[in-house]
């Protein structure tokens, strides 16, 4: 159909068109990028003697400057990583530092000049239709419109007669196309923008412009033939090329979407891994596995980039080839049409002969054109099939990678949840330690009260002894007076009665007077004796009331001991909870071992998949291009993980052995208490069953505290956390303080019962107390008590001094962290890449937080606890808590709606003068007084 249309179009135009645009058959159109104007057009424009109508249009060159971004080169940079030295390495200094070289593309803004054809009036003509003759008219356009469509102006160096070799050179092996895949999003968009969308004829088409210019004022029937031919050509090209380009554009769009989603997933996984590595203490196998994974991701990114570059080059070459082919087809058709038009100008028989020869010469040309178009269609179909196959393979590869990344994301989420559980357990331990501190403070207060009561009792005892001594002296004086009186009566001389009968009345009066005086003295003596007895009775009553008061205080002390016993039971329950937490930690260790094994299997499977996907030759080639090999291969990693698994199993066995040993020690301690009841009796002389239970409870508490300290030490060694050492030292100090408190309580209880266990007999005896004898008796009783092997009074004094020092050290540890604290909120909004200023300060103890600048400066060296909460605006947001640039804690939110709040905590050791602040790196922070936007911290203890 195409040859028939072309032949009919040529014959039809031979009767209606003029020969103004005819030129030599051997002459071709010049390329659009070449400067200047074709010689035939110049001659046709200057020769106005034949036909002055519609000869006044001439083509001119039009150029414009275009700016674009192109990848000019690749840049190499060093990636620093470090890992701890393996065990047994002789020349290692604790940390092994590795450097590897990575590449990234470098883009540059470039410019190029695009040249097109613009039809204007020929020299010497002007006007809207170029009909006005003006010898002084300027042929160059003063202000180019610049609105011509530039579609075929970049094709160069293609010949229509050889389309098959060009397409054969475009085809490359599948292995080379699958090696590189990076930056498909921007490049795919640029390729889609460069494709012709509507398949309309460009305004710079020479044939269209020429025909349109020459047929403006002629009303020949050949004009309809030109308009009939152009839609057929457009329909043919649209039918053959539009589905191919549409499918190719759709595939590129889907591929770019998949790559974009993959890049987002990789970035999210990278951020999650980074958070876990910063939030927990990385072990050697974690660091090594992370370095391996990062290196593999870098290699895959380089391969993706190279693959995308190859795909872009192939698409560019295909586009150039197709555009060259279509441009040459249009040029050939225009040349043949002009030859036919030129043949129309010859008169008579010569014209018919020339027309016949031209028709005969033009007949085989459409056939060759149809053959070339068919070959072009077949090549494009084959290219479409190959592209579809490779796209399917690429989609399957991307699906596999997506599934692997999802699996890794689930594993990372599990690890993150396990770290949250560990943090909760640590918080529980801290709360229990605080409760123990409160109990210790209560015990200290009770100890002080008991000491005060004992001092008061000592003073009362001395007062009672003094009163008893005075009463004893009074009784002795009374006995002496009574004896003197009896002696005086017995010694009275009665022999002089007879001789003194005469003076009897006077003597009788004297005797009566004397007897009266004696009676008066006796009455006075009886009154004195009665007052002394009343004083003694009142003293005894006071002593009984004092003993009743002491008995009430003893009851209160017994109630206090019951309360302490209940607290000890609660502490026992807390110890059981810690045992349960230790069992949970063992389970977590086993789960981590299973996770490590699964990750090892995934790594080996990924290695096999990469080898099958890219080929052994490509992997060997890329390994040769690498600057240095990796320090470990997969076999060594597998052996290292197996060694770690065996170590974990040995550690679990050690834990079980330790549990059995602790149970044996508990049984032995219980048997020792049963075999030596006199120790409990020495502690409680009143034979109270509740006191014996208290002694046993104290012994069990001591054993549980020792076991708890050993478990905490093992957990600290397992986790290798820097803050665990301070926690272990705090627990040890707490343990020593509890032992000191227990020892002091025992001493005070023993002293109390030794002094007042027989106070009723003391009151009933009604005798004086000799303090010297009492002290001697107590010392003899102490000497009679058996001492254990290796014990001495010097050792007891030494233990008391050591416990006092430990007690003072624990108090100093927990009392020196109080004078620094701050809490501030923010009422101003913030955007990305800036420091968030919390300008509303509610607490600023120590004046170490500066609200006008938004940062906290450490006034002293120590361990600080920080907390930050931020309310993000719409869309995802991310920030980080920065400590003097050497440590960062991320805070992020992935919710699309506004008002989402994210919170994080950090414990860090700061030197004096170091700063801490919060900065926003993505998204925005809401403006206004939000309760969820706050920043605070305090000093825990100095170091």
Curated annotation (Swiss-Prot):
Subcellular compartments: Secreted, Extracellular space, Extracellular matrix
InterPro entries, alphabetized: C1q_dom, Collagen/C1q_domain, EMI_domain, Tumour_necrosis_fac-like_dom
Organism encoding this protein: Mus musculus
Glycan attachment positions: 63, 67, 205, 214, 249, 261, 350, 379, 439, 472, 583, 728, 766, 839
Residues covered by the EMI domain: 54-132
Protein's UniProt name: Multimerin-2
Phenotype when the gene is knocked out: Mmrn2 deletion mice develop normally and display no gross abnormalities, likely due to compensatory mechanisms similar to what observed with other key regulators of angiogenesis, such as thrombospondin-1. However, they display endothelial cell junctional defects associated with increased levels of phosphorylated VEGFR2.
Function: Extracellular matrix protein that plays significant roles in the vascular system and is required for the maintenance and stability of blood vessel. Affects several essential steps in angiogenesis including endothelial cell proliferation, migration, and tube formation. Positively regulates angiogenesis by acting as a ligand for CD93 receptor.
């Amino acid at each position: 159909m195409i040859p028939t249309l072309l032949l009919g179009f040529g014959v039809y135009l031979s009767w209606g068109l003029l020969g103004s645009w005819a030129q030599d058959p051997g002459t071709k159109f010049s390329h659009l990028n070449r400067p200047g104007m074709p010689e035939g057009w110049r001659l046709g424009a200057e020769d106005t003697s034949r036909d002055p109508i519609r000869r006044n249009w001439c083509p001119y060159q039009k150029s414009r400057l275009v700016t674009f971004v192109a990848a000019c080169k690749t840049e190499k940079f060093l990636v620093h990583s470090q890992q701890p030295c393996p065990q047994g390495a002789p020349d290692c200094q604790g940390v092994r530092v590795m450097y590897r070289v990575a590449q990234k593309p470098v883009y540059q803004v470039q410019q190029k000049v695009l040249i097109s054809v613009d039809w204007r009036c020929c020299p010497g003509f002007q006007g809207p239709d170029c009909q006005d003759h003006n010898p002084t008219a300027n042929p160059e356009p003063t202000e180019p419109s610049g609105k011509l469509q530039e579609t075929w102006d970049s094709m160069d160096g293609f010949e229509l007669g050889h389309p098959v070799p060009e397409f054969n050179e475009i085809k490359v092996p599948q292995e080379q196309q699958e090696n590189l895949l990076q930056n498909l999003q921007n490049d795919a968009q640029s390729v889609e923008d460069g494709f012709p969308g509507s398949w309309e004829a460009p305004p710079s088409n020479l044939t269209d412009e020429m025909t349109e210019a020459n047929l403006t004022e002629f009303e020949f029937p050949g004009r309809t033939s030109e308009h009939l031919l152009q839609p057929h050509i457009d329909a043919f090209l649209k039918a053959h090329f539009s589905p191919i380009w549409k499918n190719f554009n759709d595939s590129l769009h889907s591929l770019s979407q998949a790559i974009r989603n993959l890049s987002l997933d990789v970035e999210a996984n990278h951020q999650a891994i980074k958070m876990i590595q910063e939030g927990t203490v990385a072990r050697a196998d974690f660091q090594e596995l992370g370095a391996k994974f990062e290196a593999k991701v870098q290699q895959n990114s380089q391969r993706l980039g190279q693959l995308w570059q190859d795909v872009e080059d192939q698409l560019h070459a295909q586009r150039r080839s197709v555009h060259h082919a279509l441009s040459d087809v249009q040029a050939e058709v225009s040349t043949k049409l002009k030859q036919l038009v030129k043949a129309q100008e010859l008169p008579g028989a010569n014209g018919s002969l020339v027309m016949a020869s031209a028709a005969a010469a033009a007949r085989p040309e459409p056939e060759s054109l149809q053959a070339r178009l068919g070959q072009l269609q077949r090549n494009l179909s084959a290219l479409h099939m190959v592209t579809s196959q490779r796209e399917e393979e690429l989609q399957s590869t991307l699906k596999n990678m997506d599934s692997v990344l999802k699996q890794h994301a689930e594993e990372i989420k599990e690890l993150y949840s396990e770290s949250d559980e560990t943090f909760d357990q640590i918080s529980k331990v801290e709360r229990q330690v605080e409760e123990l501190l409160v109990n210790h403070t209560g015990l200290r207060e009770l100890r002080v009260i008991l000491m005060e009561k004992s001092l008061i009792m000592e003073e009362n005892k001395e007062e009672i002894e003094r009163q008893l001594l005075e009463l004893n002296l009074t009784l002795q004086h009374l006995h002496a007076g009574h004896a003197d009186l009896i002696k005086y009566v017995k010694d009275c001389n009665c022999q002089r009665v007879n001789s003194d009968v005469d003076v009897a009345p006077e003597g009788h009066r004297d005797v009566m007077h004397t007897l009266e005086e004696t009676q008066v003295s006796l009455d006075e003596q009886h009154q004195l004796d009665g007052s002394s007895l009343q004083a003694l009775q009142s003293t005894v009553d006071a002593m009984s009331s004092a003993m009743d008061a002491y008995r009430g205080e003893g009851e209160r002390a017994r109630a206090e001991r019951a309360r302490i016993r209940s607290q000890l039971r609660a502490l026992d329950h807390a110890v059981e909870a810690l045992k349960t937490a230790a069992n949970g930690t063992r389970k977590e260790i086993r789960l981590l071992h299973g996770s490590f094994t699964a990750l090892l299997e995934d790594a080996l499977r990924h290695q096999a998949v990469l080898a099958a996907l890219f080929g052994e030759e490509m992997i060997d080639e890329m390994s040769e291009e690498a600057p240095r090999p990796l320090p470990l291969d997969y076999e060594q990693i597998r052996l290292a993980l197996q060694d770690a698994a065996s170590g974990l199993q040995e550690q679990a066995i050690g834990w079980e052995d330790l549990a059995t040993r602790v149970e044996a020690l508990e049984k032995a301690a219980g048997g020792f208490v049963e075999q030596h009841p006199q120790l409990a009796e020495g502690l409680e002389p009143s034979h109270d069953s509740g006191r014996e239970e208290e002694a046993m409870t104290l012994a069990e508490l001591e054993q549980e505290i020792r076991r708890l300290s050993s478990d905490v030490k093992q957990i600290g060694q397992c986790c290798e956390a820097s803050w665990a050492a301070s926690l272990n030292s705090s627990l040890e100090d707490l343990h020593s303080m509890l032992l000191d408190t227990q020892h002091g309580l025992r001493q005070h209880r023993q002293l109390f019962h030794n002094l007042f266990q027989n106070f009723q007999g003391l009151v009933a005896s009604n005798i004086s107390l000799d303090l010297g004898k009492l002290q001697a008796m107590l010392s003899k009783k102490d000497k009679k008590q058996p001492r254990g092997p290796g014990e001495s009074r010097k050792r007891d004094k030494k233990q008391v001094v050591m416990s006092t020092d430990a007690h003072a050290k624990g108090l100093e540890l927990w009392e020196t962290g109080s004078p620094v604290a701050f809490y501030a909120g923010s009422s101003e909004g913030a955007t990305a890449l800036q420091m968030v200023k919390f300008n509303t300060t509610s607490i600023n103890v120590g004046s170490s937080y500066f609200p006008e600048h938004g940062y906290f400066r450490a006034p002293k060296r120590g361990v600080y606890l920080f907390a930050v909460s931020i309310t993000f605006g719409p869309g995802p947001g991310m920030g980080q808590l920065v400590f003097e640039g050497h440590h960062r804690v991320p805070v992020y939110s992935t919710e699309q709606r506004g008002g989402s709040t994210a919170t994080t905590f950090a414990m860090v050791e700061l030197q004096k003068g170091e700063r801490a602040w919060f900065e926003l790196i993505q998204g925005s922070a809401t403006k206004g007084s939000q309760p969820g936007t706050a920043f605070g911290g305090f000093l825990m203890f100095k170091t």
